[in-house]
Amino acid sequence: MKLASARLVTKDVNVLAKFYQEVLRVEPIGSECYVELATTSGMIAISSKCSVDIFNAAAAEPAANRSVILDFEVEDVDQERDRLHNLVGEFILEPTDQPWGTRSMLFRDPDGNLINFFSKVSRPESGKT
């Protein structure tokens, strides 16, 4: 089995597509009802409620999720923080080294979906300083 995409349901496809276009530096492909943004390792799909209603009208609500984090591995978290400072309204977590060996920052998209940009950092071997 292969994960094809993570889909975000929104009230405004254009606003969310423009945000992710800036964040991911990829062009959205699609229409006002559904777009895809393909990265080197996966795809983010953005759709309006009308496209979800085709499957089942009660299947998803726009901007109702507070339990999923979209993780993106980047080369340099601090450079990404500088690049995104005018686009992102609030950073939930400024670039911070994590005990599991990554440097992470967290922020939200216009619908409130949580995004984690992280990069791997070297950790000292156990027992060494």
Regions found by a protein language model. Give the residues of each.
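Conserved active-site tyrosine of GNAT-family acetyltransferases
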Residues: 16-21, 84, 112
